[in-house]
Amino acid sequence: MSSHPTPSWPRRQRSEGRVALGAGLVAGGTTRLTDLAETGPLRLRLPRVEGAALEGVLLNSAGGLACGDRFAVAAEIGEGADMVLTTTAAEKIYRSDGPVTEIAAELRLGPRARLAWLPQETILYDGARLSRRLTAEIAPDAALTLFEALVFGRSARGETVREGEIRDAWRLARGGRLVYADTLRLDGAVAAHLARPAIAGGARAVATLVHAAPDAESRLDGLRGLIAAAGCAALGVEAGASAWNGLLVLRLLAPESAPLRRAATRILEGFRGLPLPRVWQT
């Protein structure tokens, strides 16, 4: 029997990042930061853009997430303020040897506040383990636009997510009352689950747009017109929209990320009447 001790390998260092910000309306009708705290590799950048809205770009200097990494964003948009939040690039969730990667976003909007939450897509690798949660509390007269896209492997590079664990939960409250709850859960054989007609019908890129505002329901016909104008059918993107109780919801399904991104870009720009943040074009 060997007298040498069994080596004790150091545990992988987990990456933890958090951005907490506040935004408020200042003289002249523009929005400025009122508070900002950053920890770990997650940072906020404020590019100079024209217009009254403040644009914030979230930057992950770690380059990706895996194996128990934790990222969180908390944003409080004050009365009458207007902000856009996006990311510098697509977020990558790498294969995990067990621990779950956690991403959380907590959004609060005061009276007449506006926020467009427009991160670029999240790309999942085979064996990824992800738990993502988005919660929002908005005033009755606030306007919140949420967009998120998930890509299950980049088909152009021959990637397929055969196995993994995905939990994606959205909770939206207006005036203290829960008005929207949506949870996606895929465990184990992810590719097989996505192939089922009742889930994704073989789609490998999915996106959701939720718009909560007093006039949300009146914009349904316009959104459906944008779906047609975006050429979703020609791109092979399935799209459907519905509206109820001050909410407008759009779902997009595509065989891969490129047509989904193309359709989403056209729809988002038409819906908001503004170009997407410049980082979307790089």
Swiss-Prot record:
**Annotated compartments:** Cytoplasm
Q: Name one GO molecular function term.
A: nickel cation binding
The job of this chain, per UniProt, is described as: Required for maturation of urease via the functional incorporation of the urease nickel metallocenter.
Domain of life, per the record?
Answer: Bacteria
Give the species. Methylobacterium sp. (strain 4-46)
Q: Name one Pfam family in it.
A: UreD
Q: Name one GO cellular component term.
A: cytoplasm
Q: Which UniProt keywords apply?
A: Chaperone, Cytoplasm, Nickel insertion
PANTHER family hit by this protein: UREASE ACCESSORY PROTEIN D
Name of this protein: Urease accessory protein UreD
**Family from the record:** Belongs to the UreD family.
Listed under subunit, the entry gives: UreD, UreF and UreG form a complex that acts as a GTP-hydrolysis-dependent molecular chaperone, activating the urease apoprotein by helping to assemble the nickel containing metallocenter of UreC. The UreE protein probably delivers the nickel.
| InterPro entries the UniProt entry points to | UreD
